[in-house]
Amino acid sequence: MESREAGIERLYPKITGRMSALYYYLIQLRKQLERVIALYVRNSPHQLVADYGCGNKPYEPLFTPFVEQYIGLDLAYNTKADVVVDPAGIIDMPAESVGFVLSTQVLEHVEDPKAYLKEAHRILEKEGKLILSTHGYWMFHPDPTDFWRWTSTGLKKIVTEAGFEVVYFEGILGRSAMGLQLFQDGLLFKLPKPLRFLLSLILQPLIIFFDKIITAKSRNEDACTFVLVAKKV
């Protein structure tokens, strides 16, 4: 799929589309990022966003209406990166040069999360903010590696120890919904292609239902993905 189209489908998935198996999850992730933008980015004096591990920059359209510049940081193989991260994890940017660091589903793939967060802290301006999402429960998905999963307290701990104050923390898909998501994903690739869509069509509404009946407190403790905002201190 053309990368721009893939990014659009990730932002606005359809239950009948290629990403039907992730339909509800992707919608909730986008809504969380939109909420974070409304709370912390929309009226901020900080006007540069660095997407750290940018991939094909799927969330760029959410941020560009509210900031002056959005740049992608990634390893040299990614032709969409504006700034190269070297193999040692060092970003070719000066200290205190960006207002926001965006990190979406990257931390679990990084061999040294502490070094990754240290570099994010280095390039952030004083009181700049890290906007980060990463997995609590999720299936193994190397891209090209996959090292980590986080508990809610473990994620807060490693971010705080990197020199940040967590000011926002929300979970996406609580225990019951996540269990159904994993059940769906476990069966998905064992089925013939024509039946995969049917499985998603059956299970996605159930995932939505069970996620709606869980409390926010429970979801923020146990979730498939956590979204946080952390201020540099």
Question: Where are the regions that the model predicts?
Answer:
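S-adenosyl-L-methionine-dependent methyltransferase catalytic module, highlighting the catalytic core
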Residues: E111-E119, E125, K129-V233
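A short beta-strand submotif of the Rossmann-like class I SAM-dependent methyltransferase core
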Residues: F100-V106
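Conserved N-terminal segment of class I S-adenosyl-L-methionine
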Residues: M1-E96, F100, L117, E221-F226, ...
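Amphipathic, alpha-helical segments enriched in basic
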Residues: R4, I8-Y12, T16, A81, ...
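Short N-terminal micro-motifs specific to bacterial/archaeal maturation
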Residues: S20, Y24, A81, L107, ...
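Flexible loop residues that form catalytic
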Residues: K57, L75, V106, I172-G174
